[in-house]
Structures are given as C-alpha cells and as structure tokens.
Regions:
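Mid-domain, small-residue-enriched loop/turn segments at the edges of structured enzyme/sensor domains
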Residues: 56-58, 91-129
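Active-site SXXK
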Residues: 18-44, 74, 130-134, 176, ...
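Short beta-strand elements bearing conserved aromatic residues within extracellular beta-rich modules
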Residues: 373-375
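Conserved catalytic neighborhood of penicillin-recognizing serine enzymes
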Residues: 38-95, 110, 140, 152-182
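Short beta-strand segments within Ig-like beta-sandwich modules, predominantly Fibronectin type-III
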Residues: 385-392
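A penicillin-recognizing enzyme superfamily signal
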Residues: 2-15, 123-129, 136-318
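Beta-strand-rich modules
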Residues: 397-419
C-alpha cells in the first residue's frame, strides 16, 4: 500500500501485529537447544498449568492437554503449555540474547511472549530474515534490497555488504529446521501441509493470534474469529514470511480458508522460485547425531530391541549429549504354553475330545491381551494342519479313523506373542 501520505509498507512497517506461534522457534525452542543443548526428543508434558504468579490457565488451540510428548511433537503441533515450560527453562535473559542475535529487539520478556502473544512484534521482513538463519547454518544476514549503486557517470559505483554474523550454532539451526520440516509434513496434527511443495525440502511454522474477550464484544465478532494468521517458511535458498489479516483490527479472519491463505500463497511463490533456482536439501552438520530413544523417558534412555514401535522415536542430539544407557523398561515377553493337554477317542462317535489348561485362566500368568489357542493336527506323521482357533480350552475333532495315529498340538496366542507349542 504505497498510497497516502506515509507510504505504509505492510512487509516492512507492520510492527504492531503479534506473531503468534511463529515466535516459538525464536524465543523458546531455539534458545533451549542453543543454551541448554536440548534434544529434539526432550521430554515435556502438555498439561494444565497457569502463568507464573497468576491464576490464568494456559490453554491449547483445541482445548485439550495431550500429556507426555517430545519437544519435537510439542513444536510441530504447536502446543502452548510445553512452549511456556520451555521458556521458563530458558529464562528471559537467554531468550532476549537469542532474539537479539537475530536482529529482534526485546525487553521485559514475560511468559506470554513464549506464545507470541506479548509485546514482541515483528514485521514480515524481519521474520523472514530471522528464519533464514535457521536455513543458513545459523548465520544471520540483515535484510537488504540494494547490493550496489552505479552513479550517473556509469563508471563510479558503491557496493553494500549486509551485516552478517553467527547468530547460533549450526546444531541449533539444523535441529530446529528438522522439527519445522514436520510442520509441513503429512504427520498427524501437522499445521501446514498446504505449504508443502513436492520435492522441495521446506521447514516452516504457522502462527495465529487471538482477540481478547473485550474485543469480541466491542467489535461484535463471531466465535472463532482471529485477527492474524502467519506462515513463515524457508529452504536453503529462500525465506518467506506471509502475514494474513486486515488493516483494521475490527475486521476479522472468520474462515479456515482465510487462515490457510498464508500457506497457499507461500506454496505458490516457493513453487515458482524453485523452478528458476532449485534449493538443495538441508544438510545435517557433524555436530548433530541421531539416536533411537524411548519417548517420555526422563532422562532419555535408548530404546532396546523390545521397545514397542509406538514408544520409540529417532531424535537428534548435540554430539556428545546423546544417551548411552538402554532402557530396562522393556524386556523379552514370553507367553506360557498350554498345559495338561489330553486327547481321548470316542469310538462310537468317531471323534476325539481334546482339552488343555492355561495360566491365563487361573490368573497366574502375566498376559494382558486376550489369549486364544491354535490347534493343529498331524495324521500318521504327515504335515501339521491348523484345525481350530478358539478361546475355549476344549474342542471335538470329528472324522477320527481307527488305526491311524493322530498328534495334536496347541499353541497359545496373545497379541503378537506365540507360546511354545504343547503336544
């Protein structure tokens, strides 16, 4: 908008809008990895808490608390309580230092800043520059549009080199980036799959701000209205920050299509840019290692071969901080074999009565899943054939012929476990 007396530029001049959750990597998780050397698998708990010194309860966008999770999941699904907890661990001084390294001025940081709902307001240009440092191995370049001026004589020129500095360690840049890749993935609860560009390695973060209860009444807003929607994403070549909203705060975003607009616009722009200058993939630096850990362990433990797939994850660590101890929580599971197996021949009916017992029936076993029994039969030493799968402990086998040799085998089954057979 270049009309009017002040030539207002939303990209550069708009510093009155809150950034929402796009601030979380900059003020919470980036500093936690940089200064505390947190892993992407660091355990956190999404639970009901209040702001320090207040009875104001902190909520999540869906009104739920999801319990124990990794900080990776907490960030890519944009949970609020883990963000506030992370800010508490980092502390306002280190958060301020990290922001300052990215060209963002701040003072008097409070816990509401952890969610991008405080006084740290950032223009889209500054937001793009800050995120670019994550994709640039931790190096921050001040935003600029002019690199060289040639004077009227056509010979004299002056070049401008932007300020460039190391804002964070390469491990911080990569580990934050790796989490933010999940934001644009198809993972469950990922917030920006609409920003993904096929074949392009992209990382990014969404952000949404809220109206206060007084504003809902003042502006007569309908439920679900929001004032701002952000998406900031980057590759190894480009960083783009897109804000969506209206110049007047009283005019609200009221539909999901409006909320998603920054994502779809990002995708359109990045698709075009990448066709002309393709971006390479983000490269893991030597300062970062990966390990398979037990989700929710504290301190983190390495997963062993018996750890269920649902309870382990491969996460990133600053080299030298990865766990060395394996979990002892998960051990080989054995299922008791059936006992007291008997078979009797009923010549008149030409059938066999086969029965057995199992520890799951008297409570002496440790089985938690229901137990069923697979019954197999061999005739005269031939191949075994499964003749029944049952939860009972007795079956009748018809068509038994006198003079033949029958061998019955019973195997207990519970979930993925199979016992040794009883014959």
């Amino acid at each position: 908008n270049y009309t009017g007396e002040f030539n207002y530029n939303f990209a550069y001049d708009m510093t009155t809008r809150q950034p929402g959750s796009t601030l979380k990597p900059l003020i919470d998780y980036g500093p936690a990895i940089e200064y505390l050397k947190w892993s992407t698998g660091q355990t956190t708990v999404d639970e009901k808490i209040t702001y320090s010194g207040s009875d104001q309860v902190i909520g999540n966008w869906d009104g739920r608390y999801l319990g124990t999770m990794t900080v990776r999941e907490a960030l890519y699904t944009s949970r609020n309580i883990p963000a506030v907890k992370t800010f508490r661990e980092v502390g306002p001084d280190r958060a301020k230092e990290f922001l300052g390294n990215l060209g963002i001025e701040s003072s008097g940081l409070t816990e509401s800043e952890a969610l991008g709902g405080g006084r740290v307001n950032i223009s889209p240009v500054q937001m793009a520059a800050s995120y670019a440092a994550f994709g640039n191995n931790g190096t921050y370049n001040s935003p600029h549009a002019i690199t060289k001026i040639v004077f009227r004589d056509g010979k004299t020129s002056k070049s401008f080199k932007p300020e460039s500095k190391k804002a964070m360690s390469d491990y911080t840049a990569y580990m934050v980036t790796d989490i933010l890749r999940d934001v644009v993935s198809n993972k469950r609860n990922a917030s920006a799959p609409r920003a993904a560009v096929a074949g392009v390695d992209i990382a990014g973060k969404t952000g949404t701000t809220n109206y206060g209860s007084d504003e809902f009444e003042k502006f007569n807003l309908k439920s679900g209205s929001v004032p701002d929607s952000w998406f900031t994403g980057y590759t190894t070549n480009y960083s783009i920050a897109i804000w969506g909203g209206y110049s007047q705060r009283k005019d609200a975003i009221t539909t999901w299509e409006e909320r998603w607009l920054p994502q779809t616009l990002f995708k359109s722009i990045m698709t075009e840019l990448n066709q002309h200058n393709p971006s390479s993939s983000f490269k893991q630096p030597s300062s970062v290692v990966s390990a398979s850990i037990v989700v929710g362990s504290n301190p983190l433990k390495l997963a062993n071969e018996y750890t269920p797939a649902t309870q382990k994850a491969t996460e990133l660590f600053v080299k030298g901080t990865e766990p060395t101890e394996y979990t002892e929580e998960f051990v080989p599971q054995n299922l008791d074999s059936p006992t007291s197996l008997q078979a009797s021949y009923n010549e008149a009916a030409q059938l066999a009565d086969v029965s057995w017992s199992h520890s799951s029936l008297d409570g002496s076993g440790e089985d938690t899943d229901p137990v069923t029994f697979e019954v197999s039969m061999k005739v005269d030493g031939g191949p075994a054939t499964v003749i029944s799968t049952t939860s009972a402990t007795a079956i009748q086998v018809p068509n038994i012929e006198r003079g033949k040799e029958y061998t019955f085998t019973v195997t207990a089954i519970s979930g993925d476990l199979r016992s040794d057979p009883a014959s």
